[in-house]
Amino acid sequence: MIKKRKVLLLTSRNISSLVVDTLCDQAEQDTAIACFYFDYASQKEQSPTNMLGSLLKQVVAGLEEIPEHIVQAFKGGKRFLGGRGLQLSQIVELLEVTLSSQRTFLCIDALDECIAAHRLKVLSSLRQILRKSADTRIFLTGRAHVRGEIESRLAGITATLFITPRKDDIYGYLRARLDEDTNPDAMDDCLEADILKKIPETVSEM
């Protein structure tokens, strides 16, 4: 069923970094990955224009050559991506065209932290993008109360999973990241043990 969907919603936000890491590790060379994290403390700044502009910037940064239509758009706006130089409709149009030529994963974390009015615009924009971009897939995370909004705005193309990570999974992820630390002496054994004990217990109970 999920294979037929273009949007995957996880109503647990605790493993979003695991999903993004897996996508980055396993993605083919011609696959683009762009991510955005909503933060409650930055709600006013994280408008639909800024959010989608950030995704566009990431996708464009991964291209070997910037398409002419994007160059011309920014010559006209003379502003940075996600800024006031481009309107939301223009950014959506640029994403439609750019994503239509390559396989892309858009990862949007903590959608529930987005202002409700902004969230509806974001979802409507994403649906518009998906209509024109057959090879684009969207990974969303958010608390359960936004599920209705998402399934309504992205009706027929959303699969929802509720996932609760196990302590062992979280411990393994933390252990792997600590082992990759390029400066292991910066953390003493007591702090490391505390991290490996408390974080898995706390997250698995959320």
Predicted regions and their residues:
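Conserved NB-ARC/NACHT P-loop NTPase core of NLR-like innate immune receptors
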Residues: 1-206
